[in-house]
Amino acid sequence: MVLCSNDTVRQLVHSTPIVAQSFIEEDGSVTLSMSDLDLVVNAENMQEAKQALIDDLTEYAEEYYQNFELYSRAPNRREHLSLVMKVLTSASKKELEDAVQCQNGKI
């Protein structure tokens, strides 16, 4: 077991990207998708979409942490740990929203 402070964990996961595919829908709304996490949100604009994505990502991170024994061993979730730790140790929701990197999605 390794014990370290939130600041140390934050430094370790600082470079972990939060990457989402972005799609502008026909009605002008914005869809953001993190397919590796099965997260998809839609909102009226990019800012609201980022906020919704971070809300869903935070919920997932908390669920991962609560079920750590299971999730950390699951082949489809094991690789999410650094992102989960980034979310859980972030200083603010705004910090996470600013960290979201949107790439043009392709259908």
Predicted regions and their residues:
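Short, charged, surface-exposed hinge/linker loops at domain edges
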Residues: 1-19, 23, 51-107
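Short aromatic-glycine-(Arg/Gly/Cys) micro-motifs in beta-strand/loop hairpins
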Residues: 16-36
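A short, exposed loop/beta-hairpin motif centered on an aromatic-Gly-Thr core
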Residues: 34-47
